[in-house]
Design a protein with these regions (language model features):
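Catalytic nucleophile loop
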Residues: 4-24
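Active-site or ligand-binding cleft "flap/edge" segments
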Residues: 1
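C-terminal and late-domain segments of enzyme folds
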Residues: 25-27, 31-132
């Protein structure tokens, strides 16, 4: 499949099929609150369970059903842990068209949210943003 992709074939997926496009794939499980459901209540380090995806997108993490299932905190948590990766939150009936060397095109009925954290700062409760 990867050879076809490199050769210019169109690869697509919905739901988990979209998530598996990235090298780092979100499984949907939480380490700290395994029974919390689809809505991620907090931004927490080392909480999101990931596995290796197909790797068509090597510098991105894809999350699906994004706004509908309120998965902002899940994707923010991962992007903060892996600032070299860009997080793409994709809604239902929406697609990201990725072609070599060009901007991503958003098509469909809803939106794609992009999180990029290379200059992000994280402050724990009670800490200052200017220092420890």
């Amino acid at each position: 499949m990867k050879e076809l992709y490199i050769g210019g074939a169109v690869i697509g997926g919905t739901s988990a099929g979209a998530a598996v496009m990235s090298e780092v794939m979100i499984t949907g499980d939480e380490k700290k609150k395994p029974k919390s459901g689809d809505e991620w209540q907090t931004i927490e380090a080392d909480n999101v369970v990931t596995v290796r995806g197909f790797g068509f997108l090597t510098k991105a993490i894809v999350d699906q059903h994004f706004a509908t299932r309120r998965r902002h905190n899940r994707l923010i948590s991962l992007v903060l842990e892996r600032p070299g990766l860009v997080g793409f939150g994709i809604d239902e009936s929406t697609a990201a068209v990725v072609t070599g060397g060009t901007p991503i095109e958003v098509v469909g009925e809803k939106d794609i949210v992009v999180y990029e954290a290379t200059i992000a700062k994280v402050a724990r409760h009670g800490a200052s943003m200017n220092g420890p």
